[in-house]
């Protein structure tokens, strides 16, 4: 995998182990609630297990915004998309731009759709995915049809 340039501020960098930065994102209980619907923060074991799974089942990238790693985004082989952005960088449309780039990646990989699981309380993510053209297909699932 190579870097994916989203725009002059955002670059997606293929995952590499960087516990010092990434563990901080997953030690925020509000972020964990958005991602896993749990208030339990991650330890290194859980973080490694998650990234090992994501990297062996898809394309996992760090999100670099203006030179700073601020989150991660993954397009799994089963077409499921996941994204995490540290709280202090949310609401800057970084996620919107990264999800759009993952849609382009899905097209390059000849996927027929992209799906995302978003919990009912996460209205911020729901609004973003709907604004990008995703359709709600179930209580927690959103899809973007590519064909």
Describe the role of every protein-language-model region.
Residues 106-118:
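Conserved GNAT acetyl-CoA-binding A-motif
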Residues 15, 85, 118:
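Hydrophobic adenine-recognition pocket in adenosine-nucleotide-binding enzymes
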Residues 89, 93-101:
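Conserved acetyl-CoA pyrophosphate-binding loop and the N-cap/start of the following alpha-helix
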Residues 96, 120-138:
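Conserved active-site alpha-helix within GNAT-family acetyltransferase domains
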Residues 37-88:
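Acetyl-CoA-dependent GNAT
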Residues 4, 121, 135-147:
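C-terminal "cap" of GNAT-fold acetyltransferases
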Residues 1-52:
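A short, well-structured alpha-helix characteristic of acyl/acetyltransferase catalytic modules
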